[in-house]
């Protein structure tokens, strides 16, 4: 009688650049992903502004699947170096200036982060994921833009 050995399937680790994860929504996403998946790496890029708090990530401290990088999504060199080092499969952007009262007082910061920072992430992803010579995109790469803001004024009738 011959026994057939089943080959052990190896999972390919998926690598995520996740921005703004010291905030409420981003930190909950980190906890969710690390609880649900064993074979992932989350590289968390966060500037740690008024909206971010490292205390939100206390529970994942020391988890080898989570790497925290303090930095700005507007920093072209930093973002490019992270793409080069980790060869991300996914980018999920939670980073944003999101308080309406602050946007009125200082709109330039909002435009810089919410518009130019997002453009920077998209450009670095394009550089990493698009082969201009063959005019093809690397398979399976994804970018997700998450956007929230406060609601103000009267709603509905």
Describe the residue ranges of each PLM region:
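N-terminal Rossmann-like NAD(P)+-binding domain of SDR-like oxidoreductases, especially those catalyzing
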Residues: 4-157
């Amino acid at each position: 009688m011959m026994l057939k050995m089943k080959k052990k399937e190896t999972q390919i680790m998926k690598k995520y650049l996740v921005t703004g994860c010291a905030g409420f929504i981003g930190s909950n996403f980190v906890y969710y992903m690390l609880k649900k998946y064993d074979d992932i790496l989350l590289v968390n890029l966060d500037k740690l502004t008024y909206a971010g708090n490292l205390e939100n990530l206390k529970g994942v401290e020391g988890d080898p699947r989570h790497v925290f990088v303090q930095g700005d999504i507007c920093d072209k060199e930093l973002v490019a170096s992270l793409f080069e080092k980790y060869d991300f499969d996914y980018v999920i952007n939670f980073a944003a200036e999101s308080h309406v009262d602050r946007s009125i007082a200082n709109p330039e910061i909002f435009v810089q982060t919410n518009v130019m920072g997002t453009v920077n992430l998209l450009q670095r992803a394009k550089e990493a994921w698009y082969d201009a010579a063959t005019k093809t995109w690397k398979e399976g790469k994804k970018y997700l833009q998450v956007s929230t803001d406060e609601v103000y004024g009267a709603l509905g009738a």
